């Protein structure tokens, strides 16, 4: 990884590792808590917080998570493989993602491009020691907000 990138970065919504070349996939190996999980051939991989589950991850067919839930959501972007589902894991489990193919990728955090990743570069995602606190106006609950934003009706 680029040496100018700080060793620790924080994301409110997501970290995304995406292909750089149009028309090609990127190959990414994923470890969960030090154990190999799988390798993805995909346009990218989204590692989202519950807050970020309603952003890019949702548009990639990932689930919507309650913001009260503590979890990390792994959502592949246009995967070229049989296992094409999102995975919800405990935030205490470290997730490592390594670029294993010869095609490079871009690391973005909360929509901001951070650096280019090449074969052998790894990104580690784990829980922050800081908890985000949000200001709420009114007495609206998460499920009420979802209903309003997506036009969901009572039946």
Where are these regions (language model features)?
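Catalytic phosphate-donor-binding core of small-molecule kinases
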Residues: 1-46, 54-155
């Amino acid at each position: 990884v680029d040496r100018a990138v700080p060793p620790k970065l924080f994301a409110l919504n997501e970290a995304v590792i995406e292909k750089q070349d149009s028309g090609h996939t990127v190959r990414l190996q994923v470890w969960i808590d030090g154990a190999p999980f799988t390798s993805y051939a995909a346009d990218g991989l989204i590692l989202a917080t519950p807050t970020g589950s309603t952003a890019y991850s949702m548009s990639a067919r990932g689930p919507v998570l309650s913001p009260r839930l503590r979890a990390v959501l792994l959502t592949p972007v246009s995967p070229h493989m049989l296992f094409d589902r999102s995975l919800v894991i405990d935030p205490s489990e470290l997730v490592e993602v390594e670029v294993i193919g010869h095609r490079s990728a871009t690391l973005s955090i909360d929509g901001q491009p951070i650096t280019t990743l090449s074969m052998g570069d790894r990104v580690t995602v784990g829980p922050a020691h800081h908890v985000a606190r949000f200001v709420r106006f009114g007495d609206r609950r998460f499920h009420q907000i979802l209903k309003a934003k997506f036009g969901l009706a009572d039946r």
